[in-house]
């Protein structure tokens, strides 16, 4: 069997519910409660469910855009929850979430080339004219 690319075990994300003038925690909303999955290279995973069931929260928690309440996530054998900021940034370049509504995921005021250029610049993959040439190269493929 191929080596797992992504392993998620018993992932949980609970959000506190606060009440009162002092914002006391009155309970928790269990947005994600015990998700486990394994993905090998070349596979594609689609999380499907009704609105509000936790699909986006699973993705954001795997990428550590929000912190998990409990569980384990391993990407290419590395413990994602144990990565330092710089290592996490490198890992995120290799992972992608495609949100369910492409109309709200893409900025209608930017061209596709502009979005690609922005990603290249943000991740420090090129500078100046290198950004333009790399963008053009990617648009040709």
Residue ranges and their predicted role:
Residues 1-141:
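ABC transporter nucleotide-binding domains
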């Amino acid at each position: 069997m191929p080596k797992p690319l992504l392993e998620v075990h018993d992932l949980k994300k609970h959000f506190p519910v606060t009440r009162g003038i002092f914002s006391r925690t009155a309970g928790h909303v269990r947005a994600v409660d015990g998700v486990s999955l394994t993905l090998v290279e070349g596979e594609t995973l689609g999380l499907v469910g009704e609105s509000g069931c936790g699909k986006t929260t699973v993705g954001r928690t795997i990428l550590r855009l929000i912190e998990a309440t409990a569980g384990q996530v391993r990407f290419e054998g590395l413990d994602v929850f144990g990565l330092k900021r710089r290592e996490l940034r490198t890992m995120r370049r290799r992972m992608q979430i495609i949100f369910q509504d492409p109309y709200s995921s893409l900025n209608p005021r930017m061209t596709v080339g502009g979005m690609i250029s922005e990603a290249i610049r943000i991740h420090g993959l090129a500078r100046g004219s290198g950004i333009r040439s790399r963008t053009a190269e990617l648009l040709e493929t």
